[in-house]
């Protein structure tokens, strides 16, 4: 959408900083909203700075946005449910779609009556947004094992989860740097003692990355956290192999894994994941997000159901 020159002039006259924000948003009302967020959040980020110094940071932020630099990296945070997640370049920005399904799952887990801790595995934790929300909101005693291949992501996840623990009272967390596609023994060892697997893996194919993602995602967010081989399905195939092998190697009665939640990116992908787990041991259901797009596959053990789906 091309903004009429007279509208550009009106924006500039109202506030020169709105013009670079418009270049990022392509929407005058969104540009004004971002201006409000930037002013508010930077003032909170730098409470001791002078008015002149704050103004320089605000102008610099607007110039960065004109180059499609993500707002969350500028403001260094992103709301996620009732908590705030610190953000930095090199670590995937939490999405509202993830926030939605995590809230639903935690709400269902909170209905459980358990005395022994629930063991939760968060594979591909990234910023730690999923683990942080669980720590802050799950009232059932629990221990989380958070896994990622990226040192940078894990360092940020530790920071976010430490802050979340202050909100909650019954959770603990451990962190593991693991290449989940290749270190199968370490992953299977964690799976073997977990009741719940929560996973938002890389799931975008090379073709979809080039054709469907925003320029800000392509330019600035880590491809390591976004792209997957095999049409975007590499992680789902690998994890299903791990789980099936683990169940074959161990007596089912001694494997507590009862609930698996995978985020997915399309209906086609959801059907693939569902087909990997629709068997005698598991029941898989597809759920949509608030935009009515298929977003998660929720998989439960038929002989050991934790929650109803």
Curated annotation (Swiss-Prot):
Intrachain S-S bonds: none
Protein's GO biological process: methylation; mitochondrial translational termination; translational termination
InterPro entries on file: HemK-like (IPR004556), N5-glutamine_MTase (IPR050320), SAM-dependent_MTases_sf (IPR029063), Small_mtfrase_dom (IPR007848)
One GO CC annotation: cytoplasm
Catalysed reaction equations from the record: L-glutaminyl-[peptide chain release factor] + S-adenosyl-L-methionine = N(5)-methyl-L-glutaminyl-[peptide chain release factor] + S-adenosyl-L-homocysteine + H(+)
Residues that hold S-adenosyl-L-methionine according to the record: 124-128, 148, 200
Pfam families attached to this UniProt entry: MTS (PF05175)
Subcellular location per the Swiss-Prot or TrEMBL entry: Mitochondrion
Major location category of this protein: mitochondrion
Claim: Methyltransferase is one of the keywords in the record: yes
Family: Belongs to the protein N5-glutamine methyltransferase family.
Function comment: Methylates MRF1 on 'Gln-270' using S-adenosyl L-methionine as methyl donor.
Descriptive protein name: Probable MRF1 mitochondrial N(5)-glutamine methyltransferase mtq1
Name of encoding gene: mtq1
């Amino acid at each position: 959408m091309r903004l009429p020159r007279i509208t550009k002039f009106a924006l500039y006259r109202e506030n020169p900083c709105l013009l670079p924000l418009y270049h990022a948003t392509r929407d005058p009302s969104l540009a004004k909203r971002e201006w409000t967020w930037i002013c508010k959040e930077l003032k909170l980020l730098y409470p001791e700075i002078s008015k002149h110094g704050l103004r320089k940071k605000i102008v610099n932020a607007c110039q960065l946005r004109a180059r499609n630099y993500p707002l969350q990296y500028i403001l260094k945070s992103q709301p996620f449910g009732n908590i705030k997640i610190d953000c930095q370049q090199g670590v995937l920005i939490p999405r509202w779609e993830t926030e939605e399904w995590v809230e639903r799952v935690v709400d269902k887990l909170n209905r459980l009556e358990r005395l022994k801790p629930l063991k939760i595995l968060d594979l591909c934790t990234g910023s730690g947004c999923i683990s942080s929300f669980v720590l802050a909101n799950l009232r059932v005693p629990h221990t989380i094992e958070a896994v990622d291949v990226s040192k940078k992501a894990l360092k940020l996840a530790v920071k976010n989860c430490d802050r979340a623990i202050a909100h909650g009272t019954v959770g603990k967390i451990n962190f593991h740097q693991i290449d989940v596609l290749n270190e199968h023994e370490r992953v299977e060892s964690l799976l073997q003692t977990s009741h719940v697997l929560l996973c938002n893996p890389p799931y975008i194919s090379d073709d979809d990355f080039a054709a469907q993602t925003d320029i800000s995602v392509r330019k600035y967010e880590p491809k390591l956290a976004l792209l997957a081989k095999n049409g975007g399905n590499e992680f789902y195939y690998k994890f299903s192999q791990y789980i099936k092998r683990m169940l074959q190697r161990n007596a089912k009665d001694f494997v507590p894994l009862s609930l698996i939640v995978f985020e997915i990116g399309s209906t086609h992908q959801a059907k693939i994941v569902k087909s990997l787990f629709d068997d005698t041991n598991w029941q898989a259901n597809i759920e949509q997000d608030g935009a009515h797009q298929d977003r998660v596959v929720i998989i439960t053990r038929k002989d050991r159901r934790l929650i109803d789906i």
